[in-house]
Amino acid sequence: MAHKKAGGSSRNGRDSAGRRLGVKKFGSEAVIPGNIIVRQRGTKWHPGTNVGMGKDHTLFALVPGKVQFETRRGREFVTVVPLAQAAE
């Protein structure tokens, strides 16, 4: 009787590349319009003031300013405080 399994082709050994999701600009970092703030699947973070959302739920800056993360009504929001207000 053979004590070893016959060597065949393995059915494992595949993996997909990481999707590079996550926060790209952290709290109080400076951004310009079009800068990506968060790449995400679904709405873990919601767009706040001066932040737009792409069709893949990517959040991006609409005005130059500083990034701010905040929780309102049990949801996490990302806002951009415009430069004029951020300086005050």
Swiss-Prot record:
Keyword annotations: Ribonucleoprotein, Ribosomal protein
Hydrolase in keyword set: no
Gene Ontology BP annotations: translation
SUPFAM superfamilies assigned: Ribosomal L27 protein-like
Region (Disordered): 1-23
Matches recorded under Pfam families: Ribosomal_L27 (PF01016)
Domain of life assignment: Bacteria
InterPro entries per UniProt: Ribosomal_bL27, Ribosomal_bL27_CS
Single annotated GO MF: structural constituent of ribosome
Cellular component aspect of the GO annotation: cytosolic large ribosomal subunit
NCBIfam families xref list: L27
Family the UniProt entry places it in: Belongs to the bacterial ribosomal protein bL27 family.
Protein name: Large ribosomal subunit protein bL27
Species annotation: Methylorubrum populi (strain ATCC BAA-705 / NCIMB 13946 / BJ001)
